[in-house]
Amino acid sequence: MQDTAKYLVHADITADGVVERSDVVGAVFGQTEGLLGDELDLRELQDASKVGRIDVEIDSENGQSFGRITIATSLDRVETAILGGALETIDRVGPCRSAIEVRKIEDVRSAKRREVVERAKSLLDGAFDESMRSSRDLVEEVRESVRVEDITDYEGLPAGPAVADSDAIVVVEGRADVLTLLQYGIKNAVAVEGTNVPEAVASLTETRTVTAFLDNDRGGELIRKELGQVGDIDYVATPPDGKCVEDLARHEVMSALREKVPYGRFKQAASDDADPEAAEQRTGEAAGATAADSEPAATDGIGGVTTDAEGKPVSSPESPAESPAADETAAVSAGTTPADAEEAAVDGATKTSTAGEEPNTPDDELTATSEAAEPGSAETKGESTAAEAPESSADGPAAAGASTDEQPKTLRGHVSDVIEAETGTFRLLDAEFAPLAAGDAGDVFEAVADAETVPAAVVVDGEASQRLLDIAAQRGIDHVVAASTGEFVKRPTSVRVRTATQLLNPEKA
């Protein structure tokens, strides 16, 4: 009956005396018999399984009894309510007066519905965690599988598929960083996986253009410092503050790589941040040098030649504001062509950039020496100073005869000695175009790679190959002059490459 019951009738009973359970059951059947007719008689309803067992719980205390009566029924709501009203007509249980009050009629189906709701909640919370997945999860899983398939190993380290063949690589911290870059189409990344830089990565950086793309935390700083000691870093890229490389969006990755800076400049900026007093001192020294150079000198009025306090001719430095038109005018007045004046300015230039500066230095930023700026100064006074010797040796026959054993002091002079003379050799020159090393043209690559002092220029009586240009760019060389040039797959922007013809005879080039 409990399985088919629709309603439960809950009633409270009190009696003025001590009664037993059997007394209560007998009173229920006896006092309701014939009260509601045959169709609603309790015995008939029990026989028809429309009313279940009558449950009675009774207790006695201080000469009184009290308890609860529960009757299960499958009748409809109206008949159940009539049955509840009939129970309240019972006024005696055994020899004692009593009172019965129906407390509530419970809908069993409602109780079952509550159980169903509670169970459904628990199932919804736990049963679907593993089986139900959103479309975003599915897309991410497929994308991750593709990225994992693309990642390869380089000497046991996570790397993109293009690391082995690419002439430029991106060094990152871990496997997750490589996966992030792969997702955005960057396939030449290799991970060091820890603060101890592997020898494979250190060796790889010596022959490739290297960009260190590491986090801005302590670990990234240590890796960058060690990589700069055991390997060769060309550029440094950093993620936005507070973010790791593996968490960057596509536009953040591309922006960081576009805004990479040369390693030397990055180190200088880092040292300035660590020691602001030294940076301020360097700034003051530079300002003082500029002020000293800008002091006006006296003019003797003869041919516009500038003289110092002792009356000796001095050449004024070229003004930064001079335009190409002014250069051409000066060249014509000195009896030379504009092209010759431009080449003389390049030959007498002083190397101002270091290995850590921005490689894309325009040619017009090379500052010509005072001798190239005023070739007629010595002729006007009839005397020549030691500082004017480089230009005089290239253009003045008298100066050339004075010391035939001296090395040329200009790039043109070295090109004439090495390439025009068809010596089959090379020369490495410093910033003042003084020779650092020389040898057979076939050994120029090894000489550049092993040079203790980084040369400013290379003059070789042979072909300027892609291999030579790559090592020149890595070492920070500004000029390469060769007898001929080969086919270049990638021409470095930091190295100015010319043939001897282009330098000595630009009108024939």
From Swiss-Prot:
Binding site for Mg(2+) 1: E173, D215
Cofactor(s) the record lists: Mg(2+)
Any Gene Ontology biological process: DNA replication, synthesis of primer
Segments crossing the lipid bilayer: none
InterPro entries hit by this protein: DnaG_primase, Primase_DnaG_arc, TOPRIM_DnaG/twinkle, TOPRIM_dom
Keyword field contains Transferase: yes
Gene3D superfamilies cross-referenced by the UniProt entry: 3.40.1360.10
Classification via CDD domains: TOPRIM_primases (cd01029)
Annotated Toprim domain residues: 167-253
Binding annotation for Mg(2+) 2: D215, D217
EC number: 2.7.7.101
Known catalytic reactions: ssDNA + n NTP = ssDNA/pppN(pN)n-1 hybrid + (n-1) diphosphate
SUPFAM superfamilies in the cross-refs: DNA primase core (SSF56731)
Its job: RNA polymerase that catalyzes the synthesis of short RNA molecules used as primers for DNA polymerase during DNA replication.
Family: Belongs to the archaeal DnaG primase family.
The protein's name: DNA primase DnaG
